[in-house]
Amino acid sequence: MLIFWAVLGGFLLDALLGDPTWLPHPVVLMGRCISALEKHLRTALPKTPRGELAGGAAVAAVLPLGTLAVTGLACWAAARLHPALGLALQMLWCGQALAAKGLAQESRNVYKELAKGDLPAARRAVARIVGRDTQNLTAAGVTRAAVETVAENASDGVIAPLLYMLLGGAPLALTYKAINTMDSMLGYKNGKYLYFGRCAAKLDDAANWLPSRLAALLWVAAAALTGNSARGAWRIWRRDRRRHASPNSAQTESACAGALGVQLAGPAYYFGEYYDKPTIGDPLREIEPRDILRANRMMYAESLLALVLGLAVRLMLVL
């Protein structure tokens, strides 16, 4: 029952507190470790495709395994001192592995700036949560970027860590976060990371394969619960879920596009380079700032569905 209560408590902590700036966050430490490992390995290994592949593979092995070992040992030691301490640590880390409240807050900030008509401020706000270049985005482009981020991060920021913590508590959830953080920092297909980031990207693809598909199905159900188009979500997901270079990224994006009746994705600039990405969904209407709020409601609805279903399954397996 430890994992049951840790997951429930962690979910409630995230819903109530999000990620307070005064509380050290494991992902920040992971990012520092990735940067340090990258710097050391790039210096130590030959600057060739083979050398960069080897360096990237080393990071992709050391960080997840190290995270699992350190967090697992910490949870074990805390539980040995007192069961309540072990549970509290697991709750804290489970809460920090989830990003529902933070995602909703950041995307709502984008909506607020758009609602005020302050496009430069909206661009700055959306730049906090997307990887693309934002300085030349129109209001529709800013809205589209925010909606896409809510949809995609509903999978890797909520559903995936929730699934892994249900399977293995906080240590497994944070191990997943280590993999996801590696991908966000190294998994680019540009000159700098084409080889060094390849293992991180492939490992992230594998870790997200099942969660992203579960998240898409839950999004269809969430669309029905929130008054959006479940039929559209199902239809566009079935049609467009593979319209992305990543096997996972278009899963929830396509369901979201169909639920809202808008078109997402399409060409974008990353670090000054133009990427001709395919569009997802049909433009049944023009996207509007309130679609950010609609996407948030569906994200919260699918999060609650995942929690209830996951805890129910966990309870049945324990009893």
Annotate each predicted stretch with a short phrase.
Residues 1-175, 179, 187-319:
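Hydrophobic alpha-helical transmembrane segments
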Residues 184:
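Glycine-rich phosphate/dinucleotide-binding loop and adjoining beta-alpha-beta core of small-molecule
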